[in-house]
Amino acid sequence: EFANIIDDEDYECGLPIAIDGTNSGVQHYAAASLSATDGEMVNLTNTERPQDVYQRVADNALMKLQKISDKVDLDETILSLYPNYEGKLRSQAYRDRKKTFPELARLWLDYGVSRSTVKRNCMTYGYSSKKYGFSDQLVDDFMKPLKDKVMRGEIDRHPFEDVERKAASFLAAINYQAIEEVISSVADGMEFFQATVDALSTENKAMRWETPIGFPVVQKYTYWNAKKVRIFLYDRVAMVEKRSQITVRERDENKIDRKKSRSAISPNIIHSMDASHLMSTVLHCKEE
């Protein structure tokens, strides 16, 4: 194939070309909600140059970090990130956050926040990833690799030494808010899906839908009933009786697990759309 390409400029190459979508989760939400703004950010519309949704989120996060570092409207910013502190401004927990937030913001600004810093958070947001999930991702993607570099002697010290988990949790909250503000169709879509599941769960019904290629999907998460059973075992070697406890779980097929259904509905629907897109592409290639 390569030789023919070099020798013949009119040769039609048959080698497969890998094509990657721009955050397919957001693409599906933008398309379903007919959001022209979000659709443009993930390259669903024709633009003069490719759009970069990750950079937009990074820019938003950087703006927030700079604002916190400069202690501009700090109370308002903290409450927007953690609404549960409303009415608790005199609590020790709140005062601790107010003291450490500017320090953590400065650490991230010194380290640098780019599109790669927010990319994984952006990609999993539409699949119901929450702040604690974002935090775990930042630990895996940045804190642990930085610690490994220190161990190998590649860098002198960890940029977030002694505050790795706090720094990850802090940026996770910043990224979550930035993503919500930049990609509004995703939040609206997830809210709609979860409201639908809530309504069905109230009537103890499973969620059902059909994908664009006609594949029927049923989401039915039911509760588990758990019972703890004490057992007595005789150890022949030690010649003693041992006590133990086991948990026996049995699924209740007649009661929908509302909490599990809420957390699973968005990723399940988007994954089913991803699968349909892949299958449609394969079928189209076969027809061509």
Language model features by range: what are they?
Residues 1-288:
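Conserved catalytic core of nucleotide polymerization and phosphodiester-bond processing enzymes
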